[in-house]
Amino acid sequence: MAADKPLRLLLGFDYGTRQIGVAVGQAVTGQARELCVLKAQNGVPDWNRVEALIKEWQPDAIVVGLPLNMDGSPSEMSERAEKFGRRLNGRFNLPVFTHDERLTTYAAKGERLAQGQRDGYRERPVDALAAALLLEGWLAEHPN
């Protein structure tokens, strides 16, 4: 999906059926940081919370992680993530892009392990960190 204006601020979503990680990133720096983890029921978030994030951050675009298989083929979750992206576009009229998110959760757990977290991923989930990593990946591939 093409954007009509320069993309300066973006929100990234690491889609999941129980939790959706959210991050914010800036095109000028190419960096992203984790914001929050939204609870979801069978992949459906609290749309009021999503709307509040959109209003607060006023992003120019959204990036949704696309969970591909290791061979690059679509996974069972790929269609659900794409549908989530279409819903974001329909509700908020923002450009939505997808980005390969393979190994972002693995990398996020590695970062947390390096910070000393050995377990407790329910109490301190890595979904928002995974969203930041996938958003940084998208920003690296799409420099302004």
UniProtKB/Swiss-Prot annotation:
Its EC number is 3.1.-.-. This is Putative pre-16S rRNA nuclease. Belongs to the YqgF nuclease family. Keywords: Cytoplasm, Hydrolase, Nuclease, Ribosome biogenesis. GO terms for cellular component: cytosol. Coiled coil: none annotated. SMART domains: YqgFc.
